[in-house]
């Protein structure tokens, strides 16, 4: 329970008035619980979307659901997406890319990445005609994001500073990663049947390509690229689901 509370405090802005000594918790092994943080985020997104959809048109409810995740996470991973875009697409050397990612200011690449991310995300949601499916998507996609983050932990080389937040998860063993993937696949299968499982195969392929690209550019992962990977992973999952629903 302490591990889950610490993960919630780490990945969300939920005000839990509980002090936990990190030295007492093995976050590497406890990271298997990370998908349950996605469950909490997803439940919040689902609640906000459902409530707004009762009184407002569907596009407004979708925007509210997307904004709900920004609220509960503090825009933590959206900021990581912007920093990653600024750094990786700066056409600079590795050291300079890492410096750019640390910069609190958002550059042109970051703004473009965020704009296209939410435009594409919103368009995909609007292409889903079943409102109940949209409800489930708001719940499930944050769980997928945490599954992608767990995949990126596998044999991770850390490119950031030793004080970086992502360094906490350096050396995560295989078994928490496998458990997290089983949880994600079970959730996708439960809500979206075999289509959900196939969609996650697409997510895994994306994760492999994304990981290879990041390693080629900066030699490993850091907190920003980990967070960005999760955000893009849930976008890719939604894309694959919409594509498969159009084919079957």
UniProtKB/Swiss-Prot annotation:
TM ranges are 24-44, 70-90, 106-126, 134-154, 168-188, 189-209, 228-248
* Chief location: membrane
Question: Which pathway does it operate in?
Answer: Cofactor biosynthesis; adenosylcobalamin biosynthesis; adenosylcobalamin from cob(II)yrinate a,c-diamide: step 7/7
Q: Does the keyword Membrane apply?
A: yes
A Pfam family of the record is CobS
Name its co-factor(s).
Mg(2+)
Keyword terms, alphabetized: Cell membrane, Cobalamin biosynthesis, Magnesium, Membrane, Transferase, Transmembrane, Transmembrane helix
Q: What is its EC number?
A: 2.7.8.26
One GO cellular component, as annotated: plasma membrane
Name which cysteines form disulfide bonds.
none
The record's Gene Ontology biological-process terms are:
cobalamin biosynthetic process
- Name the InterPro entries for this protein: CobS
Topology relative to the lipid bilayer, per the entry, is: Multi-pass membrane protein
Q: Name one GO molecular function term.
A: cobalamin 5'-phosphate synthase activity
The catalytic activity, as recorded, is: alpha-ribazole + adenosylcob(III)inamide-GDP = adenosylcob(III)alamin + GMP + H(+); alpha-ribazole 5'-phosphate + adenosylcob(III)inamide-GDP = adenosylcob(III)alamin 5'-phosphate + GMP + H(+)
Q: Where in the cell is it found?
A: Cell membrane
Give the first-level EC class, as a single word. Answer: transferase
NCBIfam families for this protein? cobS
Could you tell me what this protein does? Joins adenosylcobinamide-GDP and alpha-ribazole to generate adenosylcobalamin (Ado-cobalamin). Also synthesizes adenosylcobalamin 5'-phosphate from adenosylcobinamide-GDP and alpha-ribazole 5'-phosphate.
Question: What family does the database annotate?
Answer: Belongs to the CobS family.
Output the HAMAP family linked to this UniProt entry: CobS
Protein name per Swiss-Prot or TrEMBL = Adenosylcobinamide-GDP ribazoletransferase
Instruction: Identify the species of origin.
Output: Listeria monocytogenes serovar 1/2a (strain ATCC BAA-679 / EGD-e)
